[in-house]
C-alpha cells in the first residue's frame, strides 16, 4: 500500500502545473499573456509562478544583505497586499532566465504571503 501512495505522489509531482489565468491578463498582448502563463518557479521548474499566487507589480526593489526586497508599486487584478509593502525575496525565488517583456517588476505572492517568484523590472 505504501508503494502505491509513493508512486502516486511521484507521478503527480511530475505533472507540470498550469498557470491560473483569472482574467488579469486578458487586456495584455498575446506575447505577454504567454510569458505569464509559461513562467515557472526557479526552484521548482515544473510549477508555475502564478499557479497558486497573485501577481503584483513591484517596480522598486532594494538589496538587503544577500537578498532582494521587492516593493509593491501597483496592483494587478488583486489588491490584498497594500502598495508600498516590502516583500523579502528568498534568493532561490529570483527569476532570471525568462526575460521580462512587461517593463515592470512582477512578484508572485501566495495567499499565506509566500513568494513564488520575483522578476525584476525589465525592458520591453
Q: At which residue positions do the language-model features occur?
A:
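Positively charged n-region of N-terminal signal peptides that target proteins for export
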Residues: 1-4
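Residue-level signal for mature regions of secreted extracellular proteins and peptides
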Residues: 7, 42-43, 110
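Short, linear, compositionally biased motifs with a strong N-terminal bias
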Residues: 10-11
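N-terminal signal peptide c-region/cleavage motif recognized by signal peptidases
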Residues: 14-16
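N-terminal secretory signal peptides
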Residues: 20-71
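Generic recognition of long tandem-repeat/solenoid scaffolds
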Residues: 67-77, 114-119
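Short Fe-S-cluster ligation motifs
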Residues: 70-102
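C-terminal partner/receptor-binding element of secreted or periplasmic proteins
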Residues: 96-124
Amino acid at each position: 500500500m505504501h508503494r502505491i501512495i509513493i508512486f502516486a505522489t511521484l507521478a503527480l509531482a511530475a505533472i507540470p502545473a498550469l498557470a491560473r489565468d483569472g482574467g488579469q491578463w486578458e487586456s495584455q498582448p498575446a506575447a505577454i499573456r504567454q510569458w505569464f502563463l509559461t513562467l515557472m518557479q526557479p526552484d521548482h521548474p515544473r510549477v508555475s509562478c502564478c499557479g497558486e499566487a497573485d501577481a503584483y507589480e513591484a517596480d522598486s526593489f532594494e538589496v538587503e544583505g544577500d537578498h532582494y526586497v521587492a516593493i509593491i508599486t501597483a496592483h494587478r487584478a488583486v489588491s490584498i497586499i497594500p502598495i508600498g509593502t516590502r516583500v523579502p525575496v528568498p534568493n532561490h525565488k529570483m527569476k532570471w532566465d525568462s526575460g521580462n517583456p512587461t517593463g515592470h517588476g512582477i512578484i508572485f505572492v501566495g495567499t499565506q504571503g509566500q513568494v513564488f517568484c520575483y522578476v525584476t523590472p525589465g525592458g520591453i
